[in-house]
């Protein structure tokens, strides 16, 4: 088992970190009862001791995060870790190297897990038996801390080995570029205008009813953020859609909709009615995007074929080069800022795809 030290006063670690260089970082968090993920543990190592830093101990941690963010980090599949830390510290680390990204550029599975990577590189078995642990409960059990520490134990050696292999193939800059993309704050910023897209069943709504659903979804999003509670705790999807479909004009109308709880009407009925009423003045087109036509389907198929051929020549998965979702956004939504048209992808496949448009 890895050596670890539980740190209950995060700021006390600052001097120790100050003399270190690159850091391997992982987090444990929970979001079952909150809108924002609750950071429950941060694992950090510079190659010797593994520190398990407890953010729930009640001690200050501003100096800790200021120091942490001044370092270069190594993470594995780090997008969620970065999101949690960005919400907490409102800043990004100096740079990151994502070992999952790097592995994909060497022809390993595009979404290879940490345990799979460690097995592939070092022939070491890591057992993921505590993925569903309650990380917010204190005190943390020793086996939880050992499991958490293991999640960073091999990150720095993995970074070193992946860097060596990438450099030998002339792909190190690719991994650095794709890792840097994960530090774009826009990836972690809420876009309330897109909240309706998260609603299953909203695709069947048109005109005023869709406008009402969007207004209600926007209200729910803001309320969930304000109260730091899951969206479904504020207003369940099916209830939201039922309200939008019926377009109630009074609390009596609202209460008569099957499935709308009376306590919901009493608590926020006026807010729901206000959102529905505001939708009457919406002039923007709220109809859902049209499904791709035959010409667009043919173009997507051709693009996928060319991406697959290029990816095969590189020995990497097609989705590592350009996913179906990215290609669809280019064709249907007109996304000309896609990473497919930028950086290392532009020369390999982006310009070829652009000529098809």
PLM features: residue spans?
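N-terminal accessory regions of nucleic-acid-interacting proteins
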Residues: 1-23, 27
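An N-terminal structural lobe/cap that precedes and organizes the functional/catalytic core
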Residues: 28-45, 50
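Accessory DNA-binding and partner-docking regions appended to nucleic-acid-acting proteins
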Residues: 142, 162-357
């Amino acid at each position: 088992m890895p050596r670890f030290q539980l740190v209950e006063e995060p700021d006390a670690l600052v001097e120790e970190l100050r003399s270190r260089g690159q850091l391997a970082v992982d987090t444990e968090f929970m979001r079952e009862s909150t809108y924002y993920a609750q950071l429950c543990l941060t694992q950090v190592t510079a190659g010797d001791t593994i520190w398990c830093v407890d953010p729930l101990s009640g001690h200050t941690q501003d100096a800790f995060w200021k120091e942490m963010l001044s370092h270069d980090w190594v993470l594995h599949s780090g997008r969620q870790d970065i999101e949690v830390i960005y919400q907490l510290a409102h800043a990004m680390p100096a740079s990151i190297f994502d070992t999952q990204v790097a592995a994909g550029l060497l022809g390993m599975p595009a979404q290879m897990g940490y345990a799979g990577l460690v097995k592939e590189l070092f022939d070491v078995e890591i057992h993921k038996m505590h993925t569903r642990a309650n990380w917010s409960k204190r005190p943390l059990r020793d086996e939880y801390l050992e499991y958490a520490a293991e999640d960073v134990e091999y990150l720095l050696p993995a970074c070193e080995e992946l860097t060596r292999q990438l450099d030998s193939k002339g792909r190190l800059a690719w991994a650095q570029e794709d890792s840097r993309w994960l530090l774009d704050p826009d990836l972690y910023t809420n876009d309330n205008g897109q909240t309706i897209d998260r609603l299953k069943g909203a695709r069947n709504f048109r005109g005023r009813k869709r406008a009402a659903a969007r207004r209600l979804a926007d209200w729910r999003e803001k309320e969930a953020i304000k109260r730091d509670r899951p969206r479904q705790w504020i207003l369940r999807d099916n209830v939201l859609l039922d309200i939008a479909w019926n377009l109630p004009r009074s609390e009596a109308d609202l209460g008569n909709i099957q499935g709308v709880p009376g306590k919901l009407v009493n608590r926020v009925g006026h807010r729901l009615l206000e959102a529905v009423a505001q939708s009457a003045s919406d002039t923007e087109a709220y109809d859902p995007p049209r499904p791709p036509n035959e010409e667009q389907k043919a173009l997507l198929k051709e693009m996928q074929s060319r991406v697959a051929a290029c990816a095969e020549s590189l020995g990497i998965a097609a989705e590592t080069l350009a996913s179906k979702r990215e290609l669809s956004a280019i064709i249907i939504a007109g996304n000309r800022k896609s990473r497919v048209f930028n950086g290392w992808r532009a020369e390999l496949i982006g310009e070829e795809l652009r000529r098809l448009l």
